[in-house]
């Protein structure tokens, strides 16, 4: 859910190292939200509990502030530990806005937080809108990256990427697909792979627009198509040579390994998608 407070005010920096004195700026986004006169800034550490119920934790620090000449409010505070902190702006005893900032330990403090979706369908499988429209809707709602991962199909992710290839926006559209192969009920997401795993075998479900390598890969480079019989032969060979626990379906297990191996070879990330069931009832036993 998008914070409506951020349509009227911006606060920055939003992420910074913990246990260090940090200056934070609050900027009104328009004349309707302008600061006038004197305010109180209340800072509370989220993990320390309600200040009224746990007063011994001293989880309420207050600052009296007035806007600078540019209309922004600035104050300096030491944010303890790795956690979220509430920043409340109070005027005449009433809260004007509550904003959040985040203090982090060194391992995360130098990184950027990004918002994205690793698995999304379009009308090319069981979604409702075209890939380009789905991508636009995600960007409109503040997402930084998106992988379109339609059932059996890799080319819809390329369709979205090509739709915006000449648009100068900081938006990372990633290749992807939802892989489900014959003899295996387990669906696996191929996130960011350079080529399609589904399209390693023939089938109308992913070749309805053609079977060229430009539709099966991001750079025109991918393995040749093999027959279903060859796929099963390779999976059965894996099943004989893997250390598969008793009670586990050997072909299913080996097929998953085969899929993950290809995703890794394609420099992608393999993600188990709903590994135990779908369609409102359980289909796959626990591995």
Regions found by a protein language model. Give the residues of each.
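A metal-dependent hydrolase metal-coordination microenvironment
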Residues: 107-273, 277-284
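An N-terminally biased module of ancient metal coordination in phosphate/nucleic-acid-related enzymes
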Residues: 2-69, 75-183
């Amino acid at each position: 859910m998008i914070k409506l407070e951020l349509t009227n005010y911006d606060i920055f920096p939003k992420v910074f190292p913990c246990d260090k004195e940090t200056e934070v700026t609050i900027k009104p986004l328009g004349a309707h939200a302008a600061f006038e006169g004197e305010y109180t800034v209340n800072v509370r550490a989220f993990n320390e509990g309600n200040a009224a119920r746990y007063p011994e934790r001293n989880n309420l620090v207050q600052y009296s502030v007035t806007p600078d000449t540019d209309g922004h409010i600035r104050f300096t505070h030491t944010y303890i530990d790795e956690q979220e902190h509430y920043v409340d702006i109070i005027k005449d005893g009433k809260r004007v806005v509550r904003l959040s900032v985040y203090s982090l330990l060194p391992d995360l403090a130098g990184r950027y937080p990004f918002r994205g979706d690793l698995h999304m369908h379009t009308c090319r499988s069981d979604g409702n809108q075209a890939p380009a429209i789905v991508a636009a809707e995600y960007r409109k709602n503040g997402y930084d990256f998106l992988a379109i991962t339609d059932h059996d199909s890799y080319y819809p992710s390329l369709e979205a990427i090509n739709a915006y290839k000449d648009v100068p926006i900081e938006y990372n559209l990633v290749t992807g697909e939802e892989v489900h192969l014959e003899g295996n009920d387990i669906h696996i997401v191929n996130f960011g792979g350079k080529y399609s795993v589904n399209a390693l075998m023939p089938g109308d479900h992913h070749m309805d627009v053609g079977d060229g390598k430009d539709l099966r890969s991001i750079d025109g480079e991918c393995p040749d198509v093999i027959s279903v019989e060859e796929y099963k032969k390779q999976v059965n060979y894996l099943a004989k040579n893997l250390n598969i626990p008793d009670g586990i379906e050997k072909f299913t297990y080996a097929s998953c390994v085969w899929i993950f191996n290809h995703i890794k070879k394609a420099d992608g990330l393999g993600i188990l998608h709903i590994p135990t069931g779908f369609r409102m009832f359980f289909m796959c036993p626990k591995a």
